Amino acid sequence: MLFSFSTDFLCFLPELFFGFFSCVSLFFYSFFSGAKQRFIQKTFVLRDISFWLTLQVLFFTLLLLLNNPASYTTFFFGSLSFDIVSFYGKILLFFFILCVFIIGQTYFYIKRINSFEFFVLFSISCLGLCLMTQANDFLSFYVALELQSLCFYALASFKRDSAFSVEAGLKYFVLGAISSGIYLFGCSLLYGTVGTTNFSVFSLFFSNNFVGTIPLSGFVGFFFVIVGFFFKLTAAPFHAWAPDTYEGAPSFVSFFFAVVPKIALLVVFSRILFVCFYSWLFAWSHLLLLVSLFSVFIGALGALAQKKIKRFFVFSSISHVGFIFLAFSNGSFFGLSSAFFYLVIYLFIVFSIWSFFLFF
């Protein structure tokens, strides 16, 4: 956990590049939009510049990820981790971000999204998702999660002339704040039990030799952390915010919500279960099994009663999350690999379906 500038810089280079150019883009857009232009189609020119500049930054960030010479290690005093899971998780994440963004180009033209703020919020939320995949600490994960969530709240209510969209963003904000509070409460209990928030230390502390000596606050804190993840992953019965949010948000934003965030969340969720608390398999396997059964049945039955396509897709995703949790509850490497194989296939299917219905 020592600080080494060269190692930490190499590990963090793609995120540093992406974050730096996101800030540069924000300053450039602000200057360009505030300048007194003589031509009429200034907003349309700004939209084109915003789209292509964001696309190039995403593409070069993916190239940096693929050609990163750093070796697998933890950096920034153990708060972030560069390992095979985070590496392939970020590759998968940016691949689908690029695919979603390219598909959305026509949507931006049709819906006349001419505000550069949309592209800045999109970029910063992608940066938060990228940081989430390599989080090795409960607090670093929370900071990355809030960076992503604050942008998501604004994106969900981006149609300011639609009261339905503003309502969706407000619901998402309120329930997102509640889920973050539940997660932080669990983290505080775990910190009081162990004295740290680092995943690596948790994996050593919560070993089989110490299970009998752990106070009740440790189990309660673990439960609240897991419930916070259930909220974010729209697992039943913590899914109430999702249908209204997806329906009220712009179609491209719902498309983005449905495909990309689950990658980062499931990577961190698997790291917490199989690294920090694997010795508690007897406890969380039954909890995941129960939630997975709830999600499968509520997702399947709830979808039958829907009359709008967005709400139907939301309940479908709830059911699929249940199947992924079912594989997690197995508690073995085969269950974990099966879950991520299912996730990749699910992402391609959802991407294809949303791409078709994006313009309806």
Regions found by a protein language model. Name each.
Residues 1-360:
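Alpha-helical transmembrane segments of multi-pass membrane proteins predominantly involved
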